[in-house]
């Protein structure tokens, strides 16, 4: 399927004036092909440091507000390299 798609794109790039349109169409077609054919394979069979990450974004309606305040002071232990919790 990939070889056929690439061969057709290569053939259409050789035709004058068609080659001006074929690249944007090929990018859109390749994106649609990847989503249809390969997206589920990569989402379900991941390995590596981001394995099983959820790349589907959902809008979260949250009205929570943090009341945490920070002073901006730097602990002297940071400069010594000792940043363990006290």
UniProtKB/Swiss-Prot annotation:
Gene Ontology cellular component terms for the protein in this record: plasma membrane
Subcellular location as annotated: Cell inner membrane
Annotated keywords: Amino-acid biosynthesis, Cell inner membrane, Cell membrane, Cysteine biosynthesis, Membrane, Sulfate transport, Transmembrane, Transmembrane helix, Transport
One annotated GO biological process: sulfate assimilation
Molecular function per GO: high-affinity sulfate:proton symporter activity
Chain segments carrying region Disordered: 64-86
InterPro entries reported in the protein's UniProt record: CysZ_sulfate_transptr
Biased composition (Polar residues): 64-78
Annotated membrane topology: Multi-pass membrane protein
Segments traversing the membrane: 7-27
Family listed: Belongs to the CysZ family.
Function: High affinity, high specificity proton-dependent sulfate transporter, which mediates sulfate uptake. Provides the sulfur source for the cysteine synthesis pathway.
Name the record gives this protein: Sulfate transporter CysZ
Gene (UniProt): cysZ
């Amino acid at each position: 399927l990939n070889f056929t798609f690439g061969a057709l794109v290569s053939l259409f790039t050789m035709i004058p004036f068609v080659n001006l349109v074929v690249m944007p169409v090929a990018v859109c077609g390749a994106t649609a092909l990847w989503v249809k054919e390969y997206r589920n394979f990569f989402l379900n069979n991941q390995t590596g440091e981001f394995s099983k990450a959820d790349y589907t974004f959902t809008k979260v309606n949250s009205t929570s507000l943090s009341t945490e305040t920070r002073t901006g002071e730097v602990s002297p232990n940071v400069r010594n390299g000792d940043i363990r919790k006290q």
